[in-house]
Curated annotation (Swiss-Prot):
One of its GO terms (biological process) is lignin biosynthetic process. Involved in lignin biosynthesis. Catalyzes the final step specific for the production of lignin monomers. Catalyzes the NADPH-dependent reduction of coniferaldehyde, 5-hydroxyconiferaldehyde, sinapaldehyde, 4-coumaraldehyde and caffeyl aldehyde to their respective alcohols. Zn(2+) 1 binds at residues 47, 69-70, 163. Its cofactor is Zn(2+). It comes from Eucalyptus globulus. NADP(+) binds at residues 49, 167, 188-193, 211-216, 251, 275, 298-300. Homodimer. This is Probable cinnamyl alcohol dehydrogenase. It catalyses: (E)-cinnamyl alcohol + NADP(+) = (E)-cinnamaldehyde + NADPH + H(+); (E)-coniferol + NADP(+) = (E)-coniferaldehyde + NADPH + H(+); (E)-sinapyl alcohol + NADP(+) = (E)-sinapaldehyde + NADPH + H(+); (E)-4-coumaroyl alcohol + NADP(+) = (E)-4-coumaraldehyde + NADPH + H(+).
Amino acid sequence: MGSLEKERTTTGWAARDPSGVLSPYTYSLRNTGPEDLYIKVLSCGICHSDIHQIKNDLGMSHYPMVPGHEVVGEVLEVGSEVTKYRVGDRVGTGIVVGCCRSCSPCNSDQEQYCNKKIWNYNDVYTDGKPTQGGFAGEIVVGERFVVKIPDGLESEQAAPLMCAGVTVYSPLVRFGLKQSGLRGGILGLGGVGHMGVKIAKAMGHHVTVISSSDKKRTEALEHLGADAYLVSSDENGMKEATDSLDYIFDTIPVVHPLEPYLALLKLDGKLILTGVINAPLQFISPMVMLGRKSITGSFIGSMKETEEMLEFCKEKGLTSQIEVIKMDYVNTALERLEKNDVRYRFVVDVVGSKLD
C-alpha cells in the first residue's frame, strides 16, 4: 500500500473462542497507506456466515475475531493517493478487502474470485496484521474495496445490500437472468432470500418463494410481493410446479436435499447455491442430465457489481427489511438468527452503541 502513514487503535466486539460469544476488544488497526480510507463505522449487518466464522464451523477460525462484513461508514481521512473519495463521504465495504490485482479474475472485475483475496476479517493483511470486521468503531480499507452509498439510501438500509443484495444481483446479471419475464424461485426467506424476492421482482420476474412451512406465506405474498408460495413438504404442490422455473436461488445455510428443487427447474434451468454449508450436498446425476440443468454457485459480487446494484436499488426504491439493534444486544441477535427469528436482517447501529 506504499509508505506507512499512521497506526490507530479502535474497540470492537470480538469472539475469543468457538462459543461465538462477543465482548469488547480493543486492538490496533493496520497502518494506513496512501491508497487507504480511515472510516468511522455507522452500521453493520449481521449475516448467517458470521455465525459460521465465530463458531469455527468451517474449521478455519482464528481468535480474537471481530466479525461483520456488511459495513457502511463515514470517511474520516483519505490517503494521499486516494482519488474517488473525500472526507465526509458515506461509503460501504464488504467481505473482500484485498486481492492480487494481476490474475484473470482481478483483471476482469471479478476480484472476489481471486485466489489470493483477503477477507475483511479472520484473515491476515499484507503487513501481517490480522483483519477485523465491521463490529467496531473504525476500520481501514483500500479505496478499491469501497463504494459510495447513494444519497437516499439510509445507512442501516444500505448495510445488508453490501452482501445480501449483491449476492442476488451478481448471478442474475452474470448468468443472463436479468431480462424481464423469467420465472424464478427463492428457496429460503432470510436475509438473502428476501432481497432475492425484491430484486427479482424489480427485474420483472415471476417469483415463487419456496419454504419448509406455511408460516411465511403472508409475508412473502403481501409484504414482499412474491407471486406464488410453495411449501416443500406439499407433495401435490411440488408436483404441480415441476418444470416451471428458470432458476432457483438456494439460500439455505444448512444441509438439505437438492433433488426436490431440481425437479422444479425447466430445461436448462439453474440451481444457484448461495448458502454457506460445511457438509456435502447430494443428488443423482439423472436429475440434471435429463433436463440439462445446472447446479452452480455464486459468491457475493464484484465492487463494480456492488456499485451497479446500489444504483439499481436506488432507482427501483428497494430497501432491505431490517431490525436495528445496539451492540450490547448482538449476542442475543446471533442466537435469534440461528433460530431464523428475524425479519429479515439484523443491523447493528454501531455509531450509536457503547463499544467499550
